[in-house]
């Protein structure tokens, strides 16, 4: 049963209006697509319950579509194949429940390359997922990433790489924006998403500036004054993608980075919606999701 059917069964049209369902959403200015959402954390025992809670929050702040990845258990840095499959199954369940409000990115581990390529085929080529999530198992400049990027490009799937630059040093397999640049230069026709702007966003912005096929994702840090303004100035608004990293962060604090930035409204629309929609549109249309 999908989310709408669940709400109807729980109380009919009145329930839809009362808990942020379709009737209540019609008057909201849905202007954001969120690249970075997790069903790990937050209330609910099942993937369906957790994504339903996320959508109720999204309804309140004007987020139209969620990109889900990683599954219910977040924190296993180098997961074995069985864990990866469980995580992806949880996202598949959440996406089925959410209907047209959510899409999924397949979580892959380059340390298990053969399995990861098969998992990509299961979830993306032969399934409903539309992108790839790479986290901290292996530096993304490693050669094992090349087959994954090529497979994603064949299906026009988005490739998202977590990045950070930690004061105390990154984890053993944790990538930086500089690693993403190395990978991007080996695949100049593929557009890559550099997650979290590297954490240290001033360095992250400069690191990717000259590599035009790398886009900056701004999820998961405090809404610091000047962050988005600098990114627009150095990269152009067409290379920036909004994400929240909910439940790790709130929708509201992350939207505030863009909605409160001193940039034109046209730039805000690109960042909040149009850039991500443009990346996803080819594969979503091919799958009948748009």
Where are these regions (language model features)?
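Divalent metal-coordination and catalytic microenvironments
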Residues: 36, 104, 132, 152, ...
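Acidic/histidine-rich helix-loop elements
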Residues: 38-49, 75-82
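Active-site beta-loop-alpha junctions enriched in small/polar residues
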Residues: 38-40, 71-73, 107-111, 135-137, ...
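Active-site gating/metal-coordination segments in enzymes
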Residues: 64-65, 78-167
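Catalytic pocket-lining loop regions of alpha/beta-barrel enzymes
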Residues: 127-131, 138-241, 286-290
